[in-house]
């Protein structure tokens, strides 16, 4: 007869790697066209002027300039790039 009871296997023990989301370029930081400004799930931030949105809701600069965060209607948070001559040089 066995003196040890068979141990049950745990269903835990897995964890996925973090997705590296968040703001990559902060307010008044200089950006060049194509720079990623925010990586997000859903639209926590909406694209303003000179900012595009990818299919995974990533916001990126369409022009060279300086990043600006502001609120719009319905308390939505927007990210814009204010184009400036020689901003990111």
Curated annotation (Swiss-Prot):
Keyword terms, alphabetized: Ribonucleoprotein, Ribosomal protein
Biological processes, Gene Ontology terms: translation
GO cellular component: ribonucleoprotein complex; ribosome
InterPro entries in UniProt: Ribosomal_bL27 (IPR001684), Ribosomal_bL27_CS (IPR018261)
Entry's Gene Ontology molecular function annotations: structural constituent of ribosome
Region annotation Disordered: where it falls in the sequence: 1-21
Family: Belongs to the bacterial ribosomal protein bL27 family.
NCBIfam families reported in the protein's UniProt record: L27
Name the record gives this protein: Large ribosomal subunit protein bL27
Organism name: Erythrobacter litoralis (strain HTCC2594)
Taxonomic classification: Bacteria, Pseudomonadati, Pseudomonadota, Alphaproteobacteria, Sphingomonadales
Protein's gene: rpmA
